[in-house]
Amino acid sequence: MAPIITVVGSFAVGLTIRTPQVPIFGQTLIGSDFDMGPGGKGSNQAVATARLGANSYFVGLIGEDKLGEIATDLYQREGVDTSYLRTTTQMATGAGLIILNSKGENFII
């Protein structure tokens, strides 16, 4: 019998771009290797436990928006139970802008 794992946490879409250096206010840099993908510590754990064969439940809140659709598509594809996932029009789904420099250092907004 598969274990039941319930994860309470967040979902956010990560928008990642590489630049030679971290920009300062007012500066424009050319970036490369843009990527967009699902994330959030709780969400990542729920997906990982489902991939390992657990009955995985995710408890969280997402917006009724395009980024929220990324979450629900992900959970359906990965077999994460969303019985306790709630959606709202009162806030947007989380997003993080991740900037990586040539040294591998990053910051997230």
Outline where the language-model segments fall:
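Conserved phosphate-binding/catalytic loop of the ribokinase/pfkB sugar-kinase fold
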Residues: 87-88, 98-109
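A glycine-rich helix N-cap at a beta->alpha junction
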Residues: 74-91
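Glycine-rich phosphate/adenosyl-contacting loop at the front of the ribokinase-like
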Residues: 1-61, 66-70, 76-77
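Residue-level detector of anion-binding/catalytic polar loops
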Residues: 55, 81, 105
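Short secondary-structure transition/capping segments
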Residues: 69-72, 95-98
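Short, well-ordered, mixed-charge alpha-helical segments that flank or form enzyme active sites
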Residues: 15, 94, 106-108
